[in-house]
Amino acid sequence: MSENTITFVTGNANKLKEVIAILSTSESQDGMSKVGKYSITNKSLDLDEIQGTIEEVTINKAKAAANILKGPVLVEDTCLGFEAFNNLPGPYIKWFVKSIGLSGLVDMLYKFENKGANAICTFGYCEGPNAEVKLFQGVTKGNIVDSRGPTDFGWDSVFEPEGFDQTYAEMDKKNKNTISHRFRALDKLRDFLTNQ
C-alpha cells in the first residue's frame, strides 16, 4: 500500500458510496477516488467495538485498523442520540436497530413530547501503527418521526433533519450529502487532507 493511499475500513456498501461521493475531489488514473494527494481504497475488517463514548469507540477502531493494515486508515462511527434520553442510544444505535427495529426506535419516544435527536458522525484518521488518531466530527439536529422512505440504510427513514420536511431516506442523495452529519464530518476531513 502506498503511503498516499488511505484505506477506509467499512463493510457497508451504502456508507462507502456516500463517503466517496462526499469526500472525493477527483479520480485517479487507476479509477480510485482521490482527495488531495491521497487515493482512497476500501477494506472490510471485523473490528471489536469497545463500550464508551463515540470518540473512544472511534479512536479504538482507528488504532486497531492501523495496526492490522500497517498504514493510513480511516474509520467511522455514527451515533443517534435522543434528547429525551440524554443522547442515548448514542454509539449503540446499530444494536438498537438490529434488536428492536425502526418502529421500536420510534416507539421508545412514544411517551415523550421531545422527539429531538442528534445525528453524530465521527471519522478517525490514523497514519499507521502507534500514530495519533485525528478525529473529525459532524452533527445534524433533527427529530425522530414515523418511518418514511426506503429502509435500507440504517435509521435514515426515521430521522428528519431540522428545517426539512423529509427524512434522510426520502431526500435525494445529492441533497442529503450536503447537510448530513456525515457530510459535516467529511468536510472537515477533506480540508485536513487537502492541506497535507
Swiss-Prot record:
Its cofactor is Mg(2+); Mn(2+). It is found in: Cytoplasm; Nucleus. Mg(2+) binds at residue 49. One of its GO terms (cellular component) is nucleus. It catalyses: ITP + H2O = IMP + diphosphate + H(+); dITP + H2O = dIMP + diphosphate + H(+); XTP + H2O = XMP + diphosphate + H(+). Keywords: Cytoplasm, Hydrolase, Magnesium, Manganese, Metal-binding, Nucleotide metabolism, Nucleotide-binding, Nucleus. It holds the Pfam family Ham1p_like. It comes from the Eukaryota. This is Inosine triphosphate pyrophosphatase. It comes from Debaryomyces hansenii (strain ATCC 36239 / CBS 767 / BCRC 21394 / JCM 1990 / NBRC 0083 / IGC 2968). The gene is HAM1.
